Amino acid sequence: MTHPAQPPVRLRLATALDGLAVAFGGMTAHPDEHNCECHWGSAEELAQLKVPDTELDPDLLRRTWQAPDWSDHASVLRRILPQFATALVKGSVEPLFGLEEAGRSFARGHWQQWPTVQAEAVRDFLHAWWADTLTDPDPAVPAYEVLALVTEASATLTPWLTTWETLTDHPADDHLAEAVAKWEYDLLGDQLPWDSWENEEETRTELTAWLVRNAPARLRAPGVSGELLHRVRLLGLTGDDRWEDPHWPGHRY
């Protein structure tokens, strides 16, 4: 597919979406795959997953990626990935709680263990979407939501923070301010700001340390409140030093 002139990160994302379509075109769920008609959907809907490349209606797509009990989640995920990824980028995926749920759907498929071409297509998409989000002044999905998804999908936070650290232009800093405002309550209570399947404490510790190191210099733009900077400073304190600081916001947990 050809694309009109676009910023490099947008072109990279378009190329990654095309790559998913190529890598997973023709894929279907396992012929013996099944699910509960009472709780998931009808036999006719299940049959759609066993036909390649036909578009699912949004509700069927949602029920498919959300279902935790497929016999072969990997084959189901491969069947829906091109459409699922496009819906994610457009912001049309609506989880019950947070977008980390969609990340866990990736994780349940163990995509990093797939054949190299398929795994690289997924990896390229996640990285391209993240870079595009950080450089877009008004992304369809907030950066803090995308970070939760890609972290859960990949079982690591490090590469995503590394990318954010290297992007120091205005949109990336604005997204950082928005994320800190969203996260500070949970992080000051020593809680990760999204539900995580594993390594929750390690992820929270890494995120907190990264914010303490990087956020202060990047949150001094006009419009960022001094109180938000104090919240970041408090993240670097522990115990009584944090709770008794004159700028402690009075959060109760």
PLM features per residue range, with description:
Residues 1-27, 188-253:
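Terminal, non-catalytic domain-edge segments
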Residues 65-73, 77-208:
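Eukaryote-skewed repeat-based solenoidal scaffolds used as protein-protein interaction platforms
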Residues 2-102:
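N-terminal domain-start signal
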Residues 1-11, 43, 137-158, 165, ...:
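Charge-centric, low-complexity intrinsically disordered segments used as regulatory activation/interaction regions
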